[in-house]
Amino acid sequence: MTQQDPAAAAPRPVLVVDFGAQYAQLIARRVREVNLYSEVIPHTMPADEVAAKNPAALILSGGPSSVYADDAPSLHPELLELGVPVFGICYGFQAMTQAMGGTVAKTGLREYGRTELQIQSEAGVLHEGMGESQQVWMSHGDSVSEAPEGFTVTARTEGAPVAAFECPEKRMAGVQYHPEVLHSPKGQEVLRRFLLETAGLEPTWTAGNIAEQLIEQVREQIGDEGRAICGLSGGVDSAVAAALVQRAIGDRLTCVFVDHGLLRAGEREQVEKDFVAATGAKLVTVDEREAFLQKLAGVTEPEAKRKAIGAEFIRSFERAVAGVLADAPEGSSVDFLVQGTLYPDVVESGGGTGTANIKSHHNVGGLPDDVEFELVEPLRLLFKDEVRAVGRELGLPEEIVARQPFPGPGLGIRIIGEVTEDRLETLRAADAIARAELTAAGLDDVIWQCPVVLLADVRSVGVQGDGRTYGHPIVLRPVSSEDAMTADWTRIPFDVLEKISTRITNEVEEVNRVVLDVTSKPPGTIEWE
């Protein structure tokens, strides 16, 4: 299995140098909100490799370490000599200070959480016109006590005598606080000013330009005669990926919808109707429900489930290829497989240097090593909101682009325990009720997604009618998010929760308890498995 490096078709990136920050991906996303392309790289990347990426600017992220710790992440001084704009945040601010001859002190004055930032008389470009003070989010122990030579101190706090500085001549600046988080209300404007005014970058990373670049990239990868096959899951990612490839190579793309039996109620019909109507793409639907259930028989370990589903999905594709080839010119083959892999998928699967593997993602690590296709992943560098924007640019209807995320392995990873037909029917019924009530309450635009999970290996004691019951609990997992990198549990009104619980326990056999998951991400991932 081979893949093309999609970064080759991207514009010059704003590189976020990750020093172990919790919010490194969020920084990249905030940069993209300014319509600039951004990637995250580890602080261990050699300076020559960083230079080879031809960065438009560098942002040095925060991190949990003290610059005085023996194992503190180091900043390669050569990065400050590349001649590109540099912006330091929190730990990156301190590392930048040390590398350029300033002073970082152990003041003993720690600042965590909301802090009042005092703007100096020389406010500089970043804080000009923002008043004498503003609320920011701090998380530091050490503080910069003296700025490097040539830098102007523009802000301070009680615990940080130098909380921000700038050097317009070098196109460098830094802040002790976290401008990327919502708890710093003016932080995004500060970041925007650095990128557009101090760094002088042109904001060209728009939905229209992204779509054009990706279409051209796909044409280049597949060529003038190559043929591709794309698996549709019913979700926005695969639909947008397929629409991009369809725009690039036309009828040389065949979309395959594998009904693996792990779908929610009505999903097969929705794909066959909505997607074909929107794109005019060729669609082949194959019924593989029995094959998937056989592969999942007796499998309870989450990773084993993902691997089994991924492996069988590819085998289903290979069986479908024979039918696709029947309509192809004599002697031709299908060599390319289109996937809707997103940037968070790659990050969670440890796809970047220095990242930990959280779980194998169904679009990244769940494929067999002997897969016979070359992967086409046009969305690999995009966040979910960017995918939706590209989908709208391509003319896909809201029913597709606004659809809540649904994992490729489907309900298979929302059943905690062995996957059986009876358990699927139970979960399908509960899920349909939850979705219907959330829609009726007008919460579709509030909730990022709401996984409904069946604890199939748990028996809960209950009383229904005049008898004692031993049913299964259902877990509701509503979350709010911007890009799935982080998420907070959604505060659904109690009356809506009551309706969902009452209907599920009354209408779904085998369920006698409904519980609410109130865990944010981190520490918990959105899906249970």
Swiss-Prot record:
Its EC number is 6.3.5.2. PROSITE patterns: GATASE_TYPE_1, GMPS_ATP_PPASE. This is GMP synthase [glutamine-hydrolyzing]. CDD domains: GATase1_GMP_Synthase, GMP_synthase_C. SUPFAM superfamilies: Adenine nucleotide alpha hydrolases-like, Class I glutamine amidotransferase-like, GMP synthetase C-terminal dimerisation domain. Homodimer. It catalyses: XMP + L-glutamine + ATP + H2O = GMP + L-glutamate + AMP + diphosphate + 2 H(+). GO terms for cellular component: cytosol.
